[in-house]
Swiss-Prot record:
Residues 58-89 are annotated as: Framework-3. Residues 102-111 are annotated as: Framework-4. GO terms for biological process: adaptive immune response. Residues 36-50 are annotated as: Framework-2. GO terms for cellular component: immunoglobulin complex. This is Ig kappa chain V region 3368. Keywords: Adaptive immunity, Immunity, Immunoglobulin.
Length: 111
């Protein structure tokens, strides 16, 4: 059976300078094979975090990924207006070598 990725919350509002926490749960263990992306309207997704906690090149250290197994978290600290967008977790490996298995997305609104 396919692994299901469940993201919470579906939407979150944050003040500039605040902190946002997004959670992603896998229906079975995926080790640390979890990526986080940010997407803005009309743009392709931008990789933020790979292997659960590794910061992609050029990405601000305000973004932090943690977790392993089935429970993962993306934390955005010192939220800036430019952080607004939709964030997705992605299972980037499974036993069937199926990729591009994304969570449902979390909209981040910055006030």
């Amino acid at each position: 059976a396919d692994i299901v990725m469940t993201q919470t919350p579906s939407s979150v509002s944050a003040a500039v300078g605040g902190t946002v926490t997004i959670k992603c749960q896998a229906s079975e263990s995926i080790g640390n094979e979890l990526a986080w992306y940010q997407q803005k309207p009309g743009q392709p997704p931008k990789l933020l975090i790979y292997r659960a906690s590794k910061l992609a090149s050029g990405v601000s250290s305000r973004f932090k990924g943690s977790g392993s197994g089935t429970e993962f978290t993306l934390t955005i600290s010192g939220v800036q207006c430019d952080d607004a967008g939709i964030y997705y977790c992605q299972q980037d490996w499974n036993s069937n070598n199926v990729v591009n298995n994304f969570g449902g997305g979390t909209e981040v609104v910055v006030k």
